[in-house]
Amino acid sequence: MSSLSIKDVVARYDGKVNSTAQTQGSDTTPTVIQTQQASPHSDLERIVRHHLAHPWRKPCPSHTQQAFEQLQTRYRNDPLPLILDSYCGTGMSTAVLAAQHPEALVVGIDQSASRLAKHQVLGHQNYFLLQAEAESFWRCLVEAEIPLAAHWILYPNPWPKASQLRRRVHGHGAFPLLAKLGGQLEMRSNWQVYAAEFAQAAELIGLPGTLDTFTPDPPQTLFERKYHERGQTLWRFQGTFSR
């Protein structure tokens, strides 16, 4: 199959969004965030600073190590600029990124085999998907000194209860690893509080950036398409690490 344009990739990607979030964990992602938390968590700075002082050291799962070795082999054979699509779900965003960046190698990672199995291959040869735990995969990249040109984190599981802060990407012990990967980083969410927390946490680890609303053109994920069609406000954090 020949490579498709970005417009064609988006138009032809008609996979279904199931009830399971495309990202961390197994909670469902409702159409509108249901939460009692109306502002950034008061414990966020303390937690991020704790993680900076006490590096995350969870052993890497074997399937994630094997997935990383696949990437490492391909990267060593053809060291193109590397773009990582963490929590890629069905991989629509990975395919769109590959179409947008033909000069790069785009890798989508997700911990769910069932979500990855729903991927629709659309012809581009500069991307592939791996089943891996994102946080451990980040550490593998850091330890192997493989830098990122760009990193995308699109609509991560919001974990909307205030008590679930440590389950959010920016509350996780692995969050400071992002600073060591370098490159441009973009995170998108349909929850303003989550996006504001992410921006605050990113600055604490050395990534000042911008937070704004935007209109997706084209939508990068199935969830983004759904949220946009239903008129939800979408939030975007963008920043660049100096490595």
Q: At which residue positions do the language-model features occur?
A:
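S-adenosyl-L-methionine
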Residues: 2-82, 92-100, 120-145
